[in-house]
Design a protein with these regions (language model features):
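Conserved active-site alpha-helix within GNAT-family acetyltransferase domains
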Residues: 61-65, 70-91, 209, 230-245
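An N-terminal, globular interaction/scaffold subdomain
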Residues: 14-17, 22-27, 39, 44-45
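Conserved beta-strand in the GNAT
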Residues: 3, 9-19, 32, 37, ...
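Conserved GNAT acetyl-CoA-binding A-motif
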Residues: 52, 57-71, 218-229
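N-terminal membrane-targeting/anchoring modules of bacterial envelope and secretion proteins
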Residues: 2, 10, 14, 36-37, ...
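Conserved acetyl-CoA-binding loop-helix of GNAT-fold acetyltransferases
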Residues: 33-38, 43-60, 203-215
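Beta-sheet entry/capping signal
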Residues: 1, 8-13, 27-30, 65-68, ...
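Intrinsically disordered, low-complexity, positively biased terminal segments
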Residues: 23, 102-356
Length: 356
């Protein structure tokens, strides 16, 4: 934790904790940047810039190639090299319009479990999803206890208590859902809603089955969920996808603190190689040319881009060509955009299911 003081009083702070972030082909030790702020009385004095400078220097010294955060104001963090790396979506589904476009065979059985049992059965499912989804981060047992399954009154925002449903096949957990039932009635008619905090399936069939369970809960009028992946199966399964009211927003931002190490840590979809010229004025050790495999080079670049743009393509959430269209990438060598997009392609849309 970095803090700024004025005459002995704390006027600003910026925290970070370590986790392993999934990237295409593996995982990377990452600084999860959080609780960043400066008192209103001390704005416009360069305090945030100094804290970001000290924090990124420390992250580099600890050997963490990446930093990631959720941005309350994205324009602030772009100045320090963070790029939008993933999107997410919210849904608000009327239960009367939750039918699937085709029948889905229901596999397994669902059990409601207590939080102590959930601490045993849910993490293995999460870990399987995490291992194949860029943008997710590994959770420790303590994180599960204190952040995911802890359910004090202040976290409920007036809603119901945290419920946990586990879908099992031959006694083995294959999916789970964390949700709240917020009961309400108007003129004796149920108008409540299911608030889905997290739903994961180790296999596509299990994920679909646990969502079908959530959509079929009685006495509820709607199902709400936030922080969903852009490739969510309900977008293709819903008989009336417009009724999902799927709204897209920004997800995590990624900053390559050590460009060479970060590029070397992920895998690529082709055997091609090219040279990327990185512009990084805030972390000058990155201001250089790198091969896609992470080697610094004196060769002329095939592409030239600022480091925040590299953060946007790193997990596969955006393409070089998309960013070139808005002036964020310069194609130096003809055909380099297509080659880079083929290299950085990811099978899954990057997704982070939890704000930290």
């Amino acid at each position: 934790m970095h803090v700024a003081t004025d005459n002995g009083s704390i006027v600003g702070g910026a925290g970070a904790f370590q986790f392993d972030l999934t990237v295409p082909g593996g995982s990377v030790r990452t600084a999860g940047v959080t609780v960043v702020g400066v008192l209103p009385s001390h704005r416009r004095r360069g305090i945030l810039r100094e804290m970001m400078r000290a924090q990124l220097d420390d992250i580099q010294a600890r050997g963490e190639p990446l930093a990631a955060l959720w941005a309350s104001e994205a324009s602030i963090y772009r100045r320090y090299g963070y790029g939008l790396a993933a999107l997410c979506g919210d849904m608000n589904i009327p239960r009367t319009h939750s039918d699937f476009v085709r029948p889905v065979e229901r596999k397994g059985t669902v059990r409601i479990v207590g939080h102590d049992e959930a601490l045993t059965v849910c993490p293995p499912v999460y870990d399987r999803v995490c291992a194949e989804t860029p943008g997710m981060f590994a959770r420790t047992r303590e994180w599960w206890k204190s952040r995911v399954l802890d359910d004090p009154e202040w976290r409920r925002f007036g809603g119901g208590e945290l419920s946990v449903a586990v879908l099992e096949d031959d006694g083995r957990p294959q999916a789970y859902a964390l949700y709240r039932l917020n009961f309400s009635y108007e003129d004796g008619v149920p108008t409540g809603k299911v608030v889905v905090l997290e739903a994961m399936g180790a296999e596509p069939e299990a994920e679909i089955a646990v969502w079908r369970f959530l959509l079929d809960i009685d006495w509820m009028a709607s199902i709400e969920a936030e922080l969903l992946p852009l490739d969510h199966p309900l977008l293709l399964l819903a008989a009336e996808p417009g009724r999902l009211r799927f709204r897209v927003g920004d997800g995590i931002f990624v900053r390559l603190v050590d460009v060479g190490a970060a590029l070397a840590a992920r895998s690529y979809a082709t055997d091609d190689d090219l040279v990327i010229g990185v512009v990084d004025t805030f972390c000058p050790w990155n201001d250089a040319c790198f091969t896609v495999r992470g080697q610094k080079t004196m060769e002329e670049p095939d592409l030239r881009l600022p480091v925040d743009t590299l953060g946007s393509v790193y997990l596969g959430g955006f393409t070089f060509r998309q960013l070139a269209r808005v002036g964020c990438v310069e194609e130096v060598s003809e055909g380099a955009l297509d080659r880079a997009d083929a290299l950085f392609r990811s099978e899954r849309a990057p997704w982070c299911p939890e704000i930290f």
